[in-house]
Amino acid sequence: MRFDVIIVVSLLCLGCMMQPKPEASLYQRIGGLPMLTRISNQTLDIVSKDPKTSRSFDGVKMKTLKESLTNFLCVKTGGDCVYEGETMQKSHADLHITTAEFEWMVDVLRERLDVNGVGTREKNELLKILAPMKRDVVTN
């Protein structure tokens, strides 16, 4: 009887030691703050200069916008940043962003994720998180 108890306790302890490690957050898997900063900066550099979308960036302090977007993505992917910006709806209300403009920015973001080596799984997870925001950003 005592031997049986020792075996059971040993197996339970072994099972506790073999618990799978929790999966890394999307933030970690993407590459953390350095990668999110790079992707945010590159995306905004492209869309702010492209004739299809540049009008939305007239008079915008790009350094502040880049920091804000980086913090926003950090929070949305599970990082420990703090986003202090407005809601998506409030910050885009007066910009009259069209569906075509929104989709162009998503295309640029997708391309920047690819160029920077972000995996397909992580890219799709991020886009799935951001997709519902279309209704808050597009007003035309």
Predicted regions and their residues:
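Bacterial N-terminal signal peptides that target proteins for export
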Residues: M1-I6
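Core of compact, soluble alpha-helical bundle domains
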Residues: M17-N140
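C-terminal motif of bacterial Sec signal peptides marking the signal peptidase cleavage site
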Residues: C13-G15
